[in-house]
Amino acid sequence: YTNEKAALIVREMAELLMFRLTEKKLVTDSLTLEVGYDRENVDSGGYRGTTQTDRYGRTLPKAAHGTVRLEVPTNLGSQIVEQSVKLFRRITDPALTVRRINLTANRVQEDAGVEQVDLFHDTQKQEKEKRLQQTMLDIRNRFGKNALLKASSYEEGATMRQRNGQIGGHKA
């Protein structure tokens, strides 16, 4: 994938992560992103950076890896998506094509519903977003995962529709 298509996939993965956290009533305060690059970057001869060898003995550009801490434990899609894309932009080399992306929620805990009130966050807006996420989740559960998608899921290079039709990463 090109860097822009990979950023779109990271956005979709973050949205899926948000749905999973919301469904299980969990929150996270840390996200980890790992991006593996395609070997064609080295094979073409243009790459001069740090390399690593995969389990097949092929030379690849060294994978990008990063973690971001969220201000407070959350399952709000706006925060998870924003921080995931920012992390992607910070750790990746835009000149390289991407082969593999892993997004992980760390330090996952039950959503106790207790939040520290401060002057910098609009709690009414956050509650509205939580209700919207739950409504979206209810629609997806009732009518299927592809019943409610963002317009970006129809862009070229988006994988959400195909991913929703898979079970364990395989065609259903």
Outline where the language-model segments fall.
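Basic, low-complexity intrinsically disordered segments
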Residues: 1-172
